[in-house]
Amino acid sequence: MDERTMREIYLASFEGMIKKEKPWTIMNAYNKLNGTYLCENKEMLTDVLRREWGFDGYVMTDWGAMNDRVEALKAGCNLEMPSCEGATDAEIVAAVQDGTLDESVLDKSCEEYLNVIFKYEENRDKNAVFQREKD
């Protein structure tokens, strides 16, 4: 897809929402853009979403959309959904150990994820009671 079509037709509504509403999380899609799965698309997740639009939350996959966990981390995808229950953890560790994933990328991803948790705690209604707390 050419740049003009992408920006004028497909990205415009997302850009407005990100810049105006400042969501804490966003879910990427299953599909590919110009041959790259969106979970692994650094141009979209890092260059456009974070650098151009100022998104500072975390990005999670749509359910089952993860294809390559290490490439997704490099691209700026923080959270795999549903949980892989540790299945890709070994891939991440191996990639850090063999140098294909810089540990600072993993640190940054964790920081982005934790920042949302801290924002939630700072902004939550202290009088709200969750069902589990009632039981």
Predicted regions, residues:
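Glycoside hydrolase catalytic-domain context in secreted enzymes
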Residues: 1-135
